[in-house]
Amino acid sequence: MDVNILTMFVTVSALALACSLWIASYLRNWRKKGVYPPVVGTMLNHAINFERLHDYHTDQAQRYKTFRVVYPTCSYVFTTDPVNVEHILKTNFANYDKGTFNYDIMKDLLGDGIFNVDGDKWRQQRKLASSEFASKVLKDFSSGVFCNNAAKLANILAQAAKLNLSVEMQDLFMRSSLDSICKVVFGIDINSLSSSKAESGPEASFAKAFDVANAMVFHRHMVGSFWKVQRFFNVGSEAILRDNIKMVDDFLYKVIHFRRQEMFSAEKENVRPDILSRYIIISDKETDGKVSDKYLRDVILNFMVAARDTTAIALSWFIYMLCKHQHVQEKLLEEIISSTSVHEDQYSTECNDIASFAQSLTDEALGKMHYLHASLSETLRLYPALPVDGKYVVNEDTLPDGFKVKKGDSVNFLPYAMGRMSYLWGDDAKEFKPERWIQDGIFHPKSPFKFPAFQAGPRTCLGKDFAYLQMKIVAAVLVRFFKFEAVKTKEVRYRTMLTLHMNEDGLNVQVTPRLNSD
């Protein structure tokens, strides 16, 4: 018996020693390859912190620059390290793509558009879009549209000021931005900003359906694969999504058909400047007239989805920051006045003066507004339109900080959290401080891997300059004619979505006309 016990003891000890040696060897080899980022939670933590999700990520990022949240299907890796961001978006770009998960979720709305595809489809569309966004014709056309819609928005605020009414700015910016984008993208006046528009008209129906479809697609991210069951049976949110996408498609296909007919009968020199018209011409040349309406539908809808939210959300948070920092508002006013040809005694809050001031915002005038550019960038630093963005790992890789990611992992960078990291922006990182972008009176941009509000690398946002152009025109007109003060109700918070919308209450402000006596 004693021999058996001794034998068992020796055997167990030997096995334990062998296991220990194997584990030690395994860990040494693992470290050479890179280790997984520390786990800070599971999908349960995401669910518990859903209402403050981006702040939850920020809290974790203050402990670890790179960390993991574990889900049953895969690991979600998050990073705020600019070196990792550069690796993902540029250095090893080919190893990180959109993935089939996101593609499936977005396909019904975005189709095979540029923001929903990888590989050759993406490269082909990127090449064509790059050429178009560099054209002077499109820029001049867009500038005129932005100026006109900024004036319309300012006139609505002027009427509210006369009646001493507060206004909800996020809703106004969303509608104004939709008007601008629809005009630039497919040359149609939606007029969603106008209170006199026909609520039952096709343009109004399209605008509503477009908003609902966006919301329902986001809902798919929240319910996991269950949306596929709902879609199969056409029930719940999927039934709503299908109905609204049909309304969006019906409207867009009619616009495309009408534009084709219009261009077929028009003289070549009378080419319209909107994106749809230009894409029809260029695509028909490249495909010998065989470009499909579905391709055109995907192209213009992708541009709409990307452009609409970016500017509207940024402008909403910009006005919120001005309400909290009145000295910035006054400093901006001084710069805007000194940068334009419209003098103090030549304007009032009447319609014609607002319109003429908007038209005075030339490239030269806007180029002088360094503090305005800095203020908008500072807003985007703290409140990026896309607070979380990520890719899927194609093949196992090791990030520059030494952490390993495996095939199928979701690797995400955190623009919202990055804007609040003291190791990136200093001890005052959480403060709204436009001066951090200014050197000797001149705006100085930051590395896009530190400030990825417009992505970086090969997928850098093609519409970045157009977004700044629209934001600067709208901001200059509004600050020039009005002073903004927040209406003290509930605290302004974000609503956890794909984009950084304010919560349901939006941003209620009181606007006061800036009179000559100011």
Curated annotation (Swiss-Prot):
Classification lineage: Eukaryota, Viridiplantae, Streptophyta, Embryophyta, Tracheophyta
EC numbers: 1.14.-.-
CC annotations in GO: membrane
Regions crossing the membrane: 5-25, 299-319
Top enzyme category: oxidoreductase
Sorted UniProt keywords: Heme, Iron, Membrane, Metal-binding, Monooxygenase, Oxidoreductase, Transmembrane, Transmembrane helix
Binding site for heme: 461
Pfam families: p450
Entry membrane topology: Multi-pass membrane protein
Name the UniProt record assigns to this protein: Cytochrome P450 704C1
Keyword Oxidoreductase belongs to the record: yes
Main location: membrane
Molecular-function GO term, any one: monooxygenase activity
Cofactor: heme
Biological source species: Pinus taeda
Entry's family note: Belongs to the cytochrome P450 family.
Gene designation per UniProt: CYP704C1
